[in-house]
Amino acid sequence: MDKPLWKYGHLDSDPKLMIIIFRLVGMTGNAIVFWLLGFSLHRNAFSVYILNLALADFVFLLCHIIDSMLLLLTVFYPNNIFSGYFYTIMTVPYIAGLSMLSAISTELCLSVLCPIWYRCHHPEHTSTVMCAAIWVLPLLVCILNRYFCSFLDINYNNDKQCLASNFFTRAYLMFLFVVLCLSSMALLARLFCGTGQMKLTRLYVTIMLTVLGFLLCGLPFVIYYFLLFNIKDGFCLFDFRFYMSTHVLTAINNCANPIIYFFEGSFRHQLKHQTLKMVLQSVLQDTPEIAENMVEMSRNIPKP
């Protein structure tokens, strides 16, 4: 008989410590990004997405910390029903974050491939409406999935309605992944292989690094929880190792996004003694780096 997941808790204590550290750092970084974009900086189409992505990452990391506490409670209270309920809540910000990243990549791709059409047919509040829809849709998907698959039970159910709900959830995640990959590849092809060389901006580099970070660190979480978790009947030692690996990589991914923003905003920057507000603002400027640096140098030239 396979052991419950928590009985492998005596193994690999170092990854658990790493996960806690990355989650705390990620929560702090995403909270700073959310505060600056929400209350200190002028928002544009892309900053609205990044603000909501930071919020989704923060909520996801917070949910993971609470989930870890609930996992400890199951040791003393095996019949704890809150774990299944909280699993639904934890899934919402993850799907919302993936949706935000797909929307950012798609909108950036459209702005590069069809710049005139994008400027003429992009209403002012499109990003806000899209973000609202992105939050509502994962919430509905997760609630319906838990309703058809026993709302307070995360065990796999062979009911036809549950199977259909699981299939729709996986299809939705696969759709987001395909959109993310295709839009990113199209953007890279236009930037490096298209006719007429385009200047790289900090915004392009930031989005590409964020997408790359998700593909390397965030995708295993999707594979485990939405593909393998319901297929296997129980946990074994290999499952626990893979489980811990997905949590470490996911924590790194959510922690890396704010680091990418601030690193790219300050990298090769001419201004000294920058504030976090100035660094984040430079990331959101959709202007070539050379032109940006020339403007900054002209500002620093002393007037006669």
Swiss-Prot record:
Expressed in a subset of sensory neurons that includes nociceptors. Expressed in the subclass of non-peptidergic sensory neurons that are IB4(+) and VR1(-). One of its GO terms (cellular component) is plasma membrane. Keywords: Cell membrane, G-protein coupled receptor, Membrane, Receptor, Transducer, Transmembrane, Transmembrane helix. Residues 1-18, 67-80, 145-172, 230-244 are extracellular. The chain crosses the membrane at residues 19-39, 46-66, 81-101, 124-144, 173-193, 209-229, 245-265. Pfam families: 7tm_1. Gene3D superfamilies: Rhodopsin 7-helix transmembrane proteins. The keyword Translocase does not apply. Orphan receptor. May be a receptor for RFamide-family neuropeptides such as NPFF and NPAF, which are analgesic in vivo. May regulate nociceptor function and/or development, including the sensation or modulation of pain. This is Mas-related G-protein coupled receptor member A5. It comes from Mus musculus.
